[in-house]
Amino acid sequence: MALPLQRWHIAPPQPDLVAEISASTGLSPMLAQVLINRGMDTKERSQIFLDPDREPLIDPKSEFPDLISSLDILELAVKNQLKIAICGDYDADGMTSTALLLRTLRLLGVEVSYEIPSRMHEGYGINIRMVEELEARGVSLIITVDNGISAYAAIACARELGLSVIITDHHDLPEQLPPANAILNPKLINPDSPYYAIAGVGVAYILALELADRFGKRPNLESLLLELFTLGTIADLAQLTGINRRLVKQGLRLLGRSQLPGVTALIQASGIADDQKIGLKPEAIGFSLGPRINAVGRIGDPVTVIELLTADDMGKAITLAQECEATNRTRQDLCSQIEREAIAYIQSLNLNLNNERVLVVIQPNWHHGVIGIVASRLVERYGVPVFIGTTEESEEDNGEQNSSIRGSVRSIPEFNVFEALQFCREYLGKYGGHPAAGGFSMPSSNLQGFSDRLREFAHKHLELHHLKPLISVDVKADLQDISLTLLEQIDLLHPCGMGNSDPVFYTDNVRVISQQVRGKNKACLALELDRGNGSKIKAIAWRWGEYCPIPDRVDLAYKLRANKWQDKTSVELELVGIRTTWTPIFESKPAPETKNSAIWQNLKSLETILQPALIYGYDHPEVGFDSDRPIPHKLYKSLILWSLPPSITHLHWLINLTKPEIIYLGDQIPILPTTLELKQKLTKYIEQTSINLADKVNLLDLGQKLWVAPCVIVAALRELGNSCADFPPTKSLNTELKNQKHWYQISIERLMSILQH
């Protein structure tokens, strides 16, 4: 039965530290392990994480070098009633940033306007056309939000025309900074600063709040600005760490009873449950409000969202929220249609993704505003980086037709999108991005060269075991331990999101009682699972309908969610990972401890060896002795260990089967595989055993073939996402391989001591 392509990485358990963190926080041991996985590995860190308000707040003026000068420029503009323009962007971060500064400057009595570039015709960021039009309208000061740091030409043009410019942005820095009057960007401050991970709306929030403070208007604005900060930060998938975590935690409490008519109307239009209105959860923004805002930026007019978020009239807000809702439904339909077409196209190519290692999917008539979403879904489905694009036709001034490609990229952890685009830059027009995502454009005639170059990059950076979506798992759980109490404790870890993901639990060998597909296009898989105590628990898997039916026994990775029905609340599992139950175990019982009284000697020469003899070891010479495997029931006077076997268990077997009088120890040291090589070999082995439906692995035999101990194999399997639940805890694969190397270098004296004890 086909299951989703996946590889699991299970965080190594740390029982001693878990006990300490659990005792100091009152959290269950499972959630203490989650805190440790998030880097909260001391009592102090974990307590601040759970209550971020207890840590003193650092003044942003001491962190951002240009913040005071930015405030001076703005104060002068406000007092002199200069015209100000905000240059925003068409994503959620840019639109909420624009709305945030608009509200602030309007409250201060400033004549302020805003400009958003055309997604369809101009692309991201401030441009010269915008600057020239603003100068013609008498604007004196431009503030960019969520853009500007890479717009050298546009900023230089503004300065030449006599305009002042304040850049507020959070994107990576170019080689040469633009000549703005002031630049606020967290990439210019200390990476250890709590402000380092703020999004564009975070920079705008700091500037607006400090400006309101100068004019004594902070009490009038603080709550409103915090709502917009929270909305933009989560919708932009910013890291929920540092100051973001502290402020978002506060902002979520405000959003449920928002003072902003636009937010209230959007909550109503999206159908968020009434019980969340006492305090929204991040997923309400990430899966309900954020998509409706972003949909407008993708395929509609961003003015709709900015007017919604700055509306003071509820009637107007409801009308605008309904427009957002309608646009989002159109966006959903477009995504589904393009996804179906993309999958059909990929299947028609009959590609071997192990050879390709990257997907390039270019088709005409796709809306480039939504292809990034489709790219993410294709990565989830195929487990490789996806470059998706659509062709666009235009006419040159001389009447000739010009064909170009405009695309988006989504990736996997081991493939850096920006570096890949740089590697292919000779074929590209414009490009940009970061390690996980990006965008590009190029002439259609460059497609073949671009694709070939991409495959070259992919083969340099991706190994076969990378070509499956990665599921990061926090901790093992028994289904009997899943409860409302645990779910309530998870709330203490909120807000969850980027940098602090929802806890992912896993349970081995779960029995599936029933399964069925549900929802639109039967896309969801609904399960009933045996909890092992005579009770059941429900599970839902979004977009897994095509995998029904799944096996009766599976390992599951999941998040927890509340299921409310008829005033009753229960816990159900939201599945994120599934695999066939496969646990490596010994096929044979370990050998008994060695009672042999053989004499140990360092091997000096093979010429004086007492026979019959068995020679064993890595890369041993062929010298006429029995070799490698002893003949059953044959007694040997000599056992020649050209090298040690992979483990003490292997050594026990050899000695007990040969019962030698003398054991000669050579100094040969096997060449060990690297962590990467071992994972590759085991990945291939797993695929072969899965095909043969094998559920047992002879670790001794496999260890002999690879010249590593069983604990090394299990450590590698665990890093590949296999739980190996019946095997004792292991250290990291890197540590186990170091220990393996030390084993092969052990002295006779130390070895005899180990055997005796």
Give the predicted meaning of each segment.
Residues 89-90, 117-120, 147-148, 170-173, ...:
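Short, ordered loop/turn segments at secondary-structure junctions
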Residues 100, 178-217, 222-234, 656, ...:
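Short alpha-helices
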Residues 145-198:
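Histidine/acidic-residue-rich, glycine-tolerant segments that coordinate divalent metal ions
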Residues 153-157, 359, 374, 489, ...:
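A short acidic, amphipathic alpha-helical/loop segment
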